[in-house]
């Protein structure tokens, strides 16, 4: 396992990320530090990055360099926001950085920015057609794609920071918000293709301003799980947030407590941009992505087949989780046994194919709770799944999988706990969780020694008895003995006796 450092010089902050990655292309962020440095402040006045900002940047980079050296991290990716390309002293600035800390930064081109965002979405969303909207500090990018092909793209030279600065003299908050929306709308209307989108194009919001807005939406609706990626910001929910922001005292010295460390006036301008998007792209919701430029650049650096769209996004993210937090068992074998049982018991559980993805997540992470404690690891697994980066699945599927893992132990099912998630889960889901929980538990018991002794299972139903016949390649007496411990749970859930041979 190797380590990689990624440093981004943004328009308003410098981000240092430390990642772990493996030779087979899995990576995860181990540490991330963000420090506010407004590099582009007053840049439009004379075209120069100010010396005080340069000194502040280099002082910070010296610290990051020491951190890298202390851990022996030699591999790094260093890049700067394209907006810095407008600075007259950009080359002198980057040259001074290299001479001082031996870090070679390059300013991303718009093409590289588009490529990174496109690749990040291909690796974290299963959508065939998408519209990526990224809001930065001093710019925004909009990209339309169909699979691996970018169809249209545009760069708008206003982001949340410089939009807030443009209208800082407007004192009435409601009037200011409406003026910002009108201004961004005028920019969007210069791109005719934005108004010719097909209905099945999914809108994906990227960046800290979408994340802050998503956090506001989740808090306002008391959304029961705190997962940002793939969260849907609905038009209806967003309208209430926009209306609320217009009534607040928005000041650049203030912050929205519990929402973001960003200045409140900048969050408000970001929300104004999103309002303009909702007004013009005619979409009922925008899906939030936590995988932006950095994710795409790292994927391009590490993954040998980054040119190709990832065909199995969910499989990749589950494999990555198990790669960095191994359980000591072959999780693929447990999943294979779960699928066999799911098919063989179909006449009993009567669940459709929509539950297969839930089964895949829960079977792949059924032992994940042991990272916290072996005692009631099934219940611990609930929180582990909700805290893991799982891509290619909806919040409903992830939450269902968490409940399935917890309900490997049937005593863990609590109706009062279940009711907390009623806005995401349906009435029929409780029964499905109990059935899938038993299937996953049975699969883990049939692989209890980790020797992959059980290769196949056939099912016969004779009256009130279900007979599971195992096909084995070695001694599986312990596996069968352990599997017999769930006979009473099987009877309770499926209403039939179970025999395992």
Predicted regions, residues:
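N-terminal glycine/serine-rich phosphate-binding loop of ATP-dependent small-molecule kinases
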Residues: 1-5, 9-15, 19-80, 91-105
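Ser/Thr-glycine-rich phosphate-binding loops at phosphate-binding pockets of nucleotides
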Residues: 11-13, 121, 135-142, 208
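Short, surface-exposed alpha-helical segments at coil->helix boundaries
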Residues: 87-94, 484
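Helical "lid/coupling" subdomains associated with nucleotide-phosphate turnover
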Residues: 4, 18, 42-66, 86-87, ...
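Short, non-transmembrane amphipathic alpha-helical segments
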Residues: 476-497
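Short secondary-structure junctions
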Residues: 448-454, 493-496
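A structural preference for short, hydrophobic beta-strand core positions in alpha/beta folds
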Residues: 78, 107, 288, 500-501
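Hydrophobic residues embedded in beta-strands of well-ordered beta-sheets
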Residues: 14, 26-27, 140, 150, ...
């Amino acid at each position: 396992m190797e380590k990689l450092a990624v440093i981004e010089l943004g328009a308003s902050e410098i981000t240092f990320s430390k990642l772990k990655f493996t030779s087979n292309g899995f990576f995860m962020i181990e540490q991330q530090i963000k420090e506010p440095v407004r590099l582009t402040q007053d840049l439009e006045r004379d075209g120069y990055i100010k010396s005080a900002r340069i000194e502040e940047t280099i002082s910070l980079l010296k610290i990051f360099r020491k951190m890298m050296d202390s851990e022996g991290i030699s591999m790094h990716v260093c890049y700067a926001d394209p907006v810095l390309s407008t600075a007259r002293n950009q080359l002198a600035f980057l040259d001074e950085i290299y001479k001082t800390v031996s870090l070679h930064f390059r300013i991303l081109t718009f093409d590289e920015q588009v490529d990174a965002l496109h690749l990040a979405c291909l690796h974290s969303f299963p959508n065939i057609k998408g519209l990526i909207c990224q809001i930065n500090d001093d710019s925004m990018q909009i990209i339309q794609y169909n699979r691996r092909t970018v169809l249209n793209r545009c760069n708008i030279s206003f982001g949340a920071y410089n939009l807030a600065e443009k209208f800082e003299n407007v004192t009435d908050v409601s009037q200011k918000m409406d003026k910002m929306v009108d201004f961004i709308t005028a920019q969007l209307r210069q791109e005719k293709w934005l108004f010719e989108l097909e209905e099945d194009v999914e809108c994906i919001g990227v960046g800290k301003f979408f994340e802050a807005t998503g956090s506001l939406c989740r808090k306002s609706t008391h959304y029961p799980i705190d997962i940002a990626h793939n969260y849907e910001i609905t038009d209806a929910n967003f309208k209430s947030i926009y209306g609320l922001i217009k009534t607040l005292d928005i000041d650049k010295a203030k912050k929205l407590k519990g929402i973001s460390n960003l200045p409140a006036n900048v969050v408000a301008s970001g929300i104004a941009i999103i309002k303009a998007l909702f007004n013009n792209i005619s979409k009922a919701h925008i899906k939030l992505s936590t995988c932006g430029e950095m994710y795409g650049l790292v994927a391009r650096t590490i993954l040998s087949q980054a040119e190709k769209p990832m065909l199995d996004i969910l499989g990749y993210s589950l494999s990555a989780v198990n790669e960095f937090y191994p359980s000591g068992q072959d999780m693929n074998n447990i999943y294979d046994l779960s699928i066999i049982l799911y098919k063989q018991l179909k006449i009993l559980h009567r669940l459709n194919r929509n539950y297969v993805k839930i089964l895949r997540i829960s079977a792949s992470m059924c032992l994940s709770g042991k990272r916290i404690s072996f005692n009631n690891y099934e219940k611990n697994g609930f929180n582990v799944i909700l805290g893991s980066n799982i891509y290619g699945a909806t919040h409903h599927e992830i939450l269902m999988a968490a409940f399935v893992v917890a309900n490997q132990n049937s005593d863990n099912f609590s109706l009062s706990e279940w009711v907390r998630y009623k806005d995401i889960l349906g009435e029929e889901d409780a029964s499905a969780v109990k059935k899938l929980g038993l299937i996953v538990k049975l699969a883990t018991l049939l692989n209890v020694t980790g020797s992959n002794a059980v290769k196949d299972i056939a099912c016969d139903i004779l009256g009130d008895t279900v007979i599971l016949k195992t096909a084995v390649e070695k001694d599986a007496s312990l596996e069968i003995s352990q599997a017999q411990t769930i006979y009473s749970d099987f009877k309770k859930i499926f209403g039939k006796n179970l025999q395992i041979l």
